[in-house]
A protein has these predicted regions:
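Conserved catalytic cores of very large enzyme subunits
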Residues: 1-190
């Protein structure tokens, strides 16, 4: 920055390179990653990555476990049962995973619909000329012409979600200092 107080960032090749390979990048391309935006790794000149495609609240599915998927009288999540009847943390955690899967499927469907709209309404021909394989495939970056194509939603509230799951496991199921009824009531008033 102009003030000289830059914001250093540290990136870990031991994590990023395998993660990019998991997304389909060759080892050679993964080793030549660059950071775009804030923290998103990709291979320049070969990737169409829609980064920050969506922001996903990791705590919302947890909230839905306590209400059996209801929000103000409307069924917005899946029915995972009465939280006060869940006898083990594993049962509670399974309900959380079901809520997560449901809300992630909604996010993926929405992102896919937006990808289609981008391809139809905003093909980006100039950019496509500079990204490998678009010309060879006869497709814009928005139509899947790049060597690598992926969308990157961001999960937020991860620390709050992890802390909450830990507190529920510890206080309700292990130490039994709080009943699930008390936990549910406390959350309703929060």
């Amino acid at each position: 920055t102009r003030t000289g107080i830059g914001l250093p960032a540290y990136y870990n090749d031991e994590v990023i390179i395998p993660a990019l390979q998991n997304r389909g990048l060759s080892l050679a391309d993964a080793r030549e990653y660059n950071i775009i935006g804030c923290v998103e790794p990709q291979k320049a000149g070969k990737t169409e990555g829609w980064h920050d495609a969506a922001f996903f609240n990791m705590c919302r599915p947890l909230e839905m476990v306590f209400s059996n998927g209801m929000d103000k009288g409307v069924q917005v999540g899946v029915q995972t049962g009465d939280v006060t009847e869940m006898k083990s943390f594993d049962e509670f955690y399974d309900a959380y995973k079901k809520q997560m899967e449901y809300f992630i499927s909604l996010l993926v469907n929405a992102d896919n619909a937006i990808d289609v709209a981008h391809a139809e309404r905003c093909p980006l021909p100039f950019l496509s000329c500079m990204v490998d394989d678009c010309l060879k495939r006869g497709k814009s970056v928005q139509e899947g012409g790049a060597v690598y194509n992926f969308t990157g939603p961001q999960g937020f509230g991860i620390a709050n979600m992890a802390d909450s799951l830990y507190a529920i496991r510890k206080l309700v199921y292990e130490e039994k200092k709080v009943t699930m009824e008390e936990m549910k009531e406390a959350l309703a008033w929060n």
